Amino acid sequence: MLVTAGSLLGAIWTVLHLRILLLAAVTFLFLADFLKHRRPKNYPPGPWRLPLVGCLFHLDPKQPHLSLQQFVKKYGNVLSLDFANIPSVVVTGMPLIKEIFTQMEHNFLNRPVTLLRKHLFNKNGLIFSSGQTWKEQRRFALMTLRNFGLGKKSLEQRIQEEAYHLVEAIKDEGGLPFDPHFNINKAVSNIICSVTFGERFEYHDSQFQEMLRLLDEAMCLESSMMCQLYNIFPRILQYLPGSHQTLFSNWRKLKLFISDIIKNHRRDWDPDEPRDFIDAFLKEMAKYPDKTTTSFNEENLICSTLDLFFAGTETTSTTLRWALLCMALYPEVQEKMQAEIDRVIGQGRQPNLADRDSMPYTNAVIHEVQRIGNIIPFNVPREVAVDTYLAGFNLPKGTMILTNLTALHRDPKEWATPDTFNPEHFLENGQFKKRESFLPFSMGKRACLGEQLARSELFIFITSLIQKFTFKPPVNEKLSLQFRMSVTISPVSHRLCAIPRL
């Protein structure tokens, strides 16, 4: 009897002991997290957070940019919303966004680097670098892009050539249902390839197709649960399988692809006759034998080239996919565009950039596609470089800043029908009207450096396609504006019919 009672007490003590240990561990976790993430006085308000995961659980992972808006209504235009263990603040409204990106921009020039991105790029390249590295790389990239045609007739002719190839590829579909995704990707990517690599690829080139597949998959994987968890538990997840490992593998293969192109360039490189971005970068590297004093090194060459390749492909390609989808969904808009194209350009020649000023409706449609597509809903994040005071709130150094472009592009005070595709938003008395509350390329010193190129591509590609085809939904297939959330917001997979215009 005593033995039985003793065993029972021992079992009870074991259970209680485990519970006490668990409670102590949880208490310690909360206390450690509280001490680590203590906020200064006058820190922006926001929803409550949990240790490690922050406020992520408050947002719908399928549409975080939309579910965020409830907190804007509750807490105001400056609210705290921590992403995992990164202290973050969301800023809403054009006056505050302008203040951040113009008047106080020196305080917000840096980029935050998550553990995932640090593993991938280690603060190299153009997009996620900061400080001296960013200044050197951006200045060089802008100068080099201009030298190789940005804003010049030569690059416009390359876009026209690629638009011709895209039209021919779509014509080969014979009016049957097809997924436009990869043909558009190939066309857009070839423009930046001609600048960075000095050549375009044939659409059937297997290496080119694999490179685009790896990039597209990487964009989807980066927003996956395992990749987000890597930002919280990197030391554990580095040994576990999952989508994060596939992401790492994809970027390794992409870096290897760029490395091979660089090796080929070195074989016949002439510093006096640079052919493209890579040649120009190699020439810049040669000026600095001591690589410790400059960001012009092999790793930055690879990362900057990949940044140009990604930024020059993903964003414009995604916008073009939204454009064709909108044409199929809104045939009356497509008919008006075609009427304007026929009147200004006709069928006998290709569109060129000089046509844009004579085509206000087409220009308005392109801008409305960008507004409704809203492909980068939080903008590319910034980081507070020094302790900063904004709108009555204290923002400590290191805080991540997200600008709420979704609210800006769907503000009922700015847009007559904010949730509806309506090109009239960009028209006034039949003429194109610029809108201040429209920032698809951001603003300030860290605005998209390829904005001019992207605008040129969007006009020539979209106009060329609508000139030659009428896009329709396949029979018995319903299209919608449903989206897929990844690094960008893209349409869900769909098919279209491109009917040649006679």
Swiss-Prot record:
SUPFAM superfamilies xref list: Cytochrome P450 (SSF48264)
Tissue spec: Abundantly expressed in heart and liver.
Main subcellular localisation: endoplasmic reticulum
Cofactor(s), by name: heme
Subcellular location: Endoplasmic reticulum membrane; Microsome membrane
Binding site for heme: 448
Major enzyme class: oxidoreductase
Gene3D superfamilies: Cytochrome P450
One BP annotation, GO: organic acid metabolic process
UniProt membrane topology term: Peripheral membrane protein
Entries under InterPro entries matching the protein: Cyt_P450 (IPR001128), Cyt_P450_CS (IPR017972), Cyt_P450_E_grp-I (IPR002401), Cyt_P450_E_grp-I_CYP2J-like (IPR008071), Cyt_P450_sf (IPR036396), Cytochrome_P450_fam2 (IPR050182)
Reaction(s) the record says it catalyses: an organic molecule + reduced [NADPH--hemoprotein reductase] + O2 = an alcohol + oxidized [NADPH--hemoprotein reductase] + H2O + H(+)
Alphabetically ordered keywords of this record: Endoplasmic reticulum, Heme, Iron, Membrane, Metal-binding, Microsome, Monooxygenase, Oxidoreductase
EC number: 1.14.14.1
GO molecular function, one term: heme binding
Keyword Lyase: no
GO terms for cellular component: cytoplasm; endoplasmic reticulum membrane; intracellular membrane-bounded organelle
Function in brief: This enzyme metabolizes arachidonic acid predominantly via a NADPH-dependent olefin epoxidation mainly to 14,15-, 11,12-, and 8,9-epoxyeicosatrienoic acids (EET). It also acts as an omega-1-hydroxylase by metabolizing arachidonic acid to 19-hydroxyeicosatetraenoic acid (19-OH-AA).
Entry similarity comment: Belongs to the cytochrome P450 family.
Protein known as: Cytochrome P450 2J3
Organism: Rattus norvegicus
